């Protein structure tokens, strides 16, 4: 919403007509082709799957606010942290998510961005120590393995937020899995 408002302000500021701005907004489709990794919503066997590239506490707060407005019987999240962030920022992401999701899958990907093996995962786990909602935490090595584990657990009516790291590759993997085992997005 904030990005759309900024775009409207910029368009108005350079003198575009309101009708042109309105048509531009009306034509925007938030899918993996037009805005990869930006709240891409898909259906997988009757469950809602959302792929997003958020990797900081502000993004987690915005994502939690958005998914709180969506139906979801059981809520799960798949997350890895970007190793080039401050320890507190990595930890705070799962502090926020731990209050909004029943199941959390932590994954470590190949690119740790200067961190030692397991260091980012440990910080994410620390953030879940006082989780008010999370009941199940799993740790998995590999982004696609984590995505597959999350998809396998989904039941109709569930909601799963997947915080992707390798955006294009993860979206292609999700698309393939959806075409193989569920309804298309």
Where are the language model's segments positioned?
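ATP-dependent carboxylate-amine ligase
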Residues: 6-185
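Short, conserved micro-motifs enriched in small and acidic residues
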Residues: 1-5
């Amino acid at each position: 919403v904030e990005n759309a408002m900024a775009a409207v302000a910029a368009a108005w500021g350079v003198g575009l007509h309101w009708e042109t701005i309105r048509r531009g907004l009306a034509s925007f489709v938030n899918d993996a082709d037009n805005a990869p990794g930006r709240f891409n919503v898909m259906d997988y066997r009757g469950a809602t799957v959302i792929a997003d590239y958020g990797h900081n506490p502000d993004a987690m707060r915005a994502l939690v606010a958005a998914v709180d407005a969506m139906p979801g019987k059981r809520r799960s999240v798949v997350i890895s942290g970007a190793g080039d962030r401050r320890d507190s920022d990595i930890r705070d992401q799962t502090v926020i998510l731990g209050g909004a999701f029943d199941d959390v899958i932590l994954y470590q990907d190949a690119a740790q961005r200067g961190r030692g093996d397991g260091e980012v995962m440990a910080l994410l786990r620390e953030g879940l120590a006082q989780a008010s909602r999370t009941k199940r935490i799993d740790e998995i090595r590999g982004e696609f393995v984590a995505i597959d584990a999350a998809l396998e657990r989904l039941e109709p009516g569930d909601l799963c937020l997947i915080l992707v790291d390798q955006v294009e590759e993860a979206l292609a993997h999700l698309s393939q899995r959806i075409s193989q085992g569920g309804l298309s997005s």
